[in-house]
Amino acid sequence: MAQYEHNSEKFGYLNLETLDGVQTALKALGFDPGKVDGKDGPNTQNAVRQFQAHATIKIDGIVGPATRSALMNELDQAQRAAGTSSA
């Protein structure tokens, strides 16, 4: 599995190295990026900023390594809270 991939019963397979994977993760975590289309539009950037504020990381609207890592951590926490395991 690549560095920014998540696979679990709750969320399924998510590749956070792709923008549509990031959008799907944001949506699953309650941060609405709008349509999951792989495009870095204003809705996606806004959702990324909201997530970055939530994760207390640099708020810049850019999906870099810190944001991807924070998304992975948040997905893992939500997975554990749901009582199912990551694959």
Model-flagged regions — what are they?
Residues 1-38, 42, 77-87:
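Acidic, Ser/Thr/Pro/Gly-enriched interdomain connector segments
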Residues 50-86:
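Extracellular LysM carbohydrate-binding repeats and other cell-envelope/extracellular binding modules
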Residues 23-26, 37, 47-52, 60:
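Short alpha-helical segments in extracytoplasmic peptidoglycan/chitin-binding modules
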Residues 39, 43, 63-66:
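Short beta->alpha linker loops
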Residues 16-19, 47, 56:
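Generic hydrophobic/packing signal
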